[in-house]
């Protein structure tokens, strides 16, 4: 579901949540949320905004500070062409203050003079961001070992993005999707979703009713041509196909196939 800004505004006014969580680009629906409108209205209401950008980092523009996004997490495995297993995260001072209000240093690594915060302890080390942030604090606490291979992967992904340039990467993904959509439309297929909210790196197409759930076509594309496209999930399962144009796959040679 794509939320209009006034829908979020009404819900925030009615329920007064402390926290709103959104997915920037939802690959299951191929739609993107209008964060540039939603973020500022949540900031005005004093609501924290968290956004999952796993499917859009490196493929679509999103401006964390300008759009008033308080916390953002992502992944390497989509538009950055990296392996799964590492999640880039950014938070602002508002979120850092909330996180540190629950800071408790575990006994095994607790330095002399450490003072715990008043908030409840975080039950999982994996999600204890207050302790993770101490990696860069003067204490340099280390409560678990990072996967070094993933840090190398993240560094390489960043190098690739910087070498191409962010705007050039966005343009490449956008051009590839536009080309795919023009070709599909020329074939007589119907695109899914509202044009203004479509992602720049995933395209949805209605499966022609004559083809049923479309699985035979998907299998034939994979077996005969080495091309794999997806179906969807939930209410859209068997109703649309999804074609991803992300990262290294998003190249002219692949699009023209």
Task: Identify the meaning behind each predicted range.
Residues 49-50, 191, 229:
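Hydrophobic beta-strand scaffold residues
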